[in-house]
Amino acid sequence: MKLKLGLAALLGATVLFARDIIVPASELPRNAQDFISKNFKTAQIALVKKDIDSYDVTLNDGTEIDFIITGEWKDVDGKYKALPNSILPNIMPKISASLNAQIIEVSREINGYKFELSNQLKIYTDAQGNILGQKF
């Protein structure tokens, strides 16, 4: 009986602490706030959700940005709108121009980046922007 009660309490605590909580934008780490203000000058922060290891930010233009808990971005999704090249200024303009498409999502990968383009193509690069692969 005590074992069942203990397991139920553990399960309840896990469910309780695993949920995202809504926090004010001021709770974002400074580097996350700077990233947003530098790259999305006309957009405002509409919603910030925090969980145990990340922040999920939604801007008023629909853009979604995921940050790790330290404030470093891990994914930027423009929701089918072109992302600003200022996110990765040495890489993004080169990819957009060479493939004649707009970048609508960018994610950090282990050794580089994954870009999703407006023509549904996915491009994988190393940290310097050298294309490693692509897929539809």
Give the role of each language-model region.
Residues 2-6, 17-136:
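Long, terminal "pre-/pro-" and other extracytoplasmic accessory regions
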